[in-house]
Each structure stands twice: as C-alpha cells, then as structure tokens.
Amino acid sequence: MSASSVIHYHANIHKALKYAVRLDLIPSNPADKVERPKKDHFVGSFFDADEVNRLFEVSKGTKLELPILFGAFYGLRRSEVIGLKWDAIDFENDTIIIKHTVTSVNLDSKHIIVAADTTKTKSSMRTLPLVQFVKNRLLAIKAEQDNNRRLCGRSYNKEYLGYVCINEIGDLIKPHYVTEQFPKLLEANGFRHIRFHDLRHSCASLMLANGVPMKQIQEWLGHSDFSTTANIYAHLDYSSKLSSADAMLTGLGIGDAR
C-alpha cells in the first residue's frame, strides 16, 4: 500500500475517532499517536508531441477516441471526460463547460455508475475553448450518433441520451472500460505503457514545454490551488530554470545560458 493511501485511510479513521471523542464514547483519539508516513513524491509518465499525435491517429474511430482526445488535449480527468454532455458544448461560441462527472464504484464485484452535476473541486468546474479540430470531430461524431439512434429505433439505449461518450447503441462508455482498454490499445500499437491519467500529465508537460505559464496550466487543468500544479509539474518547468540561469549570468556579466 502506498504512503498516500495510508495517509488517506488514517485521515478517515482519525476523523471518525475524533467524533467518538466528542460524543464521550472514548476518552482520547488513539489515531493521534500513529505516525503517518511521508507522502510519496509522484512523478508521472508523459507522452511527447509525436506520441500524442500518433495516439490520436490510432484511436480514431474507436471507443477510446474521445476519452483520449479530451484527456490529452484538454487534460480532462477520466470522470470529466465520461461525464461530458452535448449541452455543455457550445458550437456557436466555441466553448466547452466542464460541470458534470461520471465515476464508477465497485460494489459486490459490480461496477455501479455514479453521475453527478458536480466536479472534483469548485475550480474543476471550468470553461475551455472549443478548438477547430476538436469541433470538427465532435460534429461528425454527433451526426453519427443521431444516425445510430434512428437506425436502432427502440433498441437504442435512451438512458444516456445527451452524453458525448456513448457507443453505437447508446450505451455509455464506462469509466472502468477506459481504464481497462487504454493499456491494451497502447500495447497493440507499440506504445510504451502509461496510465490513462498520464494523458492529463502529458497535456501539462506539453504546455510547459511551449511556454505556457504555470498559473494558466492550473486554470486549464482545474486544480484548486496553484501549489497543486506547482508541486506536480515544477520539475518539468525547465524554461524557468534557464531564465534563472540567464538572470544570474547577466548579473555577473558573463553571458546567457543558451
């Protein structure tokens, strides 16, 4: 079990025992005496621009096309991708609003779908620009879905009407499907292994590599505070290190770093 998981479980246990103390059920909180491990410093894997573009190509026309597109280009979380609805996409003003999520809970070995008009944090609810190449693909997919609905008639699953990530008969592309099938797609096409969530990290790393300020990346990804973004991606911000080196060299009258 990772240190992060231990910290998470400890926090929940501590909270429950704290409530028990308040109700005078126990004299003190034994969790106070437990030493928590230090949180792991996670360094994710990233795809570069060539790998992302090739991934777009091999996933086109598959059930993973849209999850990959939104995960890599917009840096959406899996829950945000699956929760995307057509009414959140404004084709006239070219905007996408991230406001609905879909997750799955494993209960008695069954995946239970949980949909909610909420996001991970308040900052996660955000509006992003609908760029032309994504717009063109979405319009084509929307037309395909409309045609599938007409062809299937009563056999079409209307439970998920309005969702973007659905298959030919209207079934939702489930969160666990994305997690299970993504590594299979990578292996089948000769990619190195990364997790689906690493597409979000790939998005951030490409932005940093192209000079996008950390603050803008925070807003793009929907992080609740700047420190979250900085803690995860500061080690990738090599351009800022070059700027710092230039400042030192200029101050010393030596030259520049590049």
Model-derived features: positions:
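Short, basic (Lys/Arg/His-rich) helix/loop patches that form interaction surfaces
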Residues: 3, 57, 61-62, 74, ...
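C-terminal secondary-structure termini that scaffold catalytic or DNA-interacting sites
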Residues: 93, 104-106, 111-125, 132-134, ...
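Proline-centered turn/helix-capping motifs that create local helix->coil transitions or kinks
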Residues: 20-30, 91, 100-107, 140-154, ...
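Catalytic-site neighborhood detector that most strongly recognizes the C-terminal catalytic loop/helix
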Residues: 46, 102-104, 135, 221-247
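DNA/chromatin major-groove-contacting recognition/catalytic segments
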Residues: 53-54, 58-60, 107-115, 210, ...
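Basic, Lys/Arg- and aromatic-enriched nucleic-acid-binding interface segment
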Residues: 7, 22, 26-28, 32-86, ...
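A short, basic/aromatic helix-end/turn motif that makes direct DNA contacts
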Residues: 83-89, 218-224, 234
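N-terminal core-binding DNA-recognition domain of tyrosine site-specific recombinases/integrases
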Residues: 1-25, 41, 172-177, 192-198
